[in-house]
């Protein structure tokens, strides 16, 4: 019996906390715990030191699981039993925490949907006319309005994403040397280029995405203004807006095609100069 006590005493006195590296001699009143499968010097740890270490790992989430950094054994963490009132409150708090992300997503989707509905209604009144637009929406089926109005901004954005100017540019570069009309209007357009420049993806830049969004949403307003300026003799608001939109798209597209072609030629004729030698070198 005395030999077993003599063997156990050195083992107890050799305990060392792997967090603060203190031993039994440093603090004889400290509470020790062996929370994992580790052996040797990392087997023991102070209860208070391990509590602080677990708090750092959980970062305020008391339900998060924490494991030993050496053997990866999960710590067995127990809490005192809760009373019925505290248990119900804790359950409600966890349910609310889990439901909040879904509720936030639903609110976001609902906000976007009703914003699209409002934009669609304003667009109808702007294109058709204020009084005529209200009459059309009052006579329409409510279900049709709830489905049709939010599709207006979606269709505008999808239509804006169609880059028809690029197809025109390809045809321009392919057949410009065969069309004498283009050569007479734009001298030198059919001349061969020394190299083919690399073209960037227009949708790769987030700025291009914002330009597509803003351009699509402001298009009905621009079409209405252009229609009033260029086709004031047309009595129908809808026809005037459609003509204004077509004219705006055609004029803007023509300038954009010409601008891109000039940039293409400028990049094709780019040269890299020799490095200037310093005098006396």
From Swiss-Prot:
Q: Where are the zinc fingers (RING-CH-type)?
A: 9-78
Residues passing through the membrane, by range: 102-122, 142-162, 212-232, 241-261
Membrane-protein topology: Multi-pass membrane protein
Q: What CDD domains does the record tag this protein with?
A: RING_CH-C4HC3_MARCH5
What's a single GO CC term here? mitochondrial outer membrane
Keyword Flavoprotein assigned to the entry: answer is no
Q: Where does Zn(2+) 2 bind?
A: 36, 38, 68, 71
Q: Please give the PROSITE patterns that the UniProt record associates with this protein.
A: ZF_RING_CH
Enzymatic reactions: S-ubiquitinyl-[E2 ubiquitin-conjugating enzyme]-L-cysteine + [acceptor protein]-L-lysine = [E2 ubiquitin-conjugating enzyme]-L-cysteine + N(6)-ubiquitinyl-[acceptor protein]-L-lysine
Short name of one Pfam family for this protein? RINGv
Q: What is its main location?
A: mitochondrion
An example Gene Ontology molecular-function term: ubiquitin protein ligase activity
Is GTP-binding a UniProt keyword of this protein?
no
Q: Which Gene3D superfamilies match?
A: Zinc/RING finger domain, C3HC4 (zinc finger)
Pathway per its UniProt entry is: Protein modification; protein ubiquitination
Which terms are listed as keywords in the entry? Answer: Endoplasmic reticulum, Membrane, Metal-binding, Mitochondrion, Mitochondrion outer membrane, Transferase, Transmembrane, Transmembrane helix, Ubl conjugation pathway, Zinc, Zinc-finger
What does the entry list as the binding residues for Zn(2+) 1?
A: 17, 20, 46, 49
**EC no.?**
2.3.2.27
The Swiss-Prot or TrEMBL note on domains reads: The RING-CH-type zinc finger domain is required for E3 ligase activity.
Function as written in the Swiss-Prot or TrEMBL entry? Mitochondrial E3 ubiquitin-protein ligase that plays a crucial role in the control of mitochondrial morphology by acting as a positive regulator of mitochondrial fission. May play a role in the prevention of cell senescence acting as a regulator of mitochondrial quality control.
Name this protein carries in UniProt: E3 ubiquitin-protein ligase MARCHF5
Organism of this sequence: Gallus gallus (Chicken)
């Amino acid at each position: 019996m005395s030999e077993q006590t003599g063997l156990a005493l050195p083992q107890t006195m050799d305990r060392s906390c792997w967090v603060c590296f203190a031993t039994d001699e440093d603090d004889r009143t400290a509470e020790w715990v062996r929370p994992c499968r580790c052996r040797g010097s990392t087997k023991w740890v102070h209860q208070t030191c391990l509590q602080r270490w677990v708090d750092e790992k959980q970062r305020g989430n008391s339900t998060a699981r924490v494991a030993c950094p050496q053997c990866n054994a999960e710590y067995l963490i127990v809490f005192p039993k809760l009373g019925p009132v505290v248990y119900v409150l804790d359950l409600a708090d966890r349910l609310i925490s889990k439901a909040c992300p879904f509720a936030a997503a639903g609110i976001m989707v609902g906000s976007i949907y009703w914003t699209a509905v409002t934009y669609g209604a304003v667009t109808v009144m702007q294109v058709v006319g204020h009084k005529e637009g209200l009459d059309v929406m009052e006579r329409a089926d409510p279900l049709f309005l709830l489905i049709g109005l939010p599709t207006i901004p979606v269709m505008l954005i999808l239509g804006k994403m169609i880059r028809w100017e690029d197809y025109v540019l390809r045809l321009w570069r392919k057949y410009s040397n065969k069309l004498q009309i283009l050569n007479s209007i734009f001298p030198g357009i059919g001349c061969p280029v020394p190299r083919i420049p690399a073209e960037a993806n227009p949708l790769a830049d987030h700025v291009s995405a914002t330009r597509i969004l803003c351009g699509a949403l402001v298009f009905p307003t621009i079409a209405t203004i252009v229609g009033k300026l260029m086709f004031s003799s047309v009595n129908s608001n809808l026809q005037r807006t459609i003509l204004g939109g077509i004219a705006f798209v055609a004029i803007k597209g023509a300038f954009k095609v010409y601008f891109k072609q000039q940039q293409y030629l400028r990049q094709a004729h780019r040269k890299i100069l020799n490095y200037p030698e310093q005098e006396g070198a």
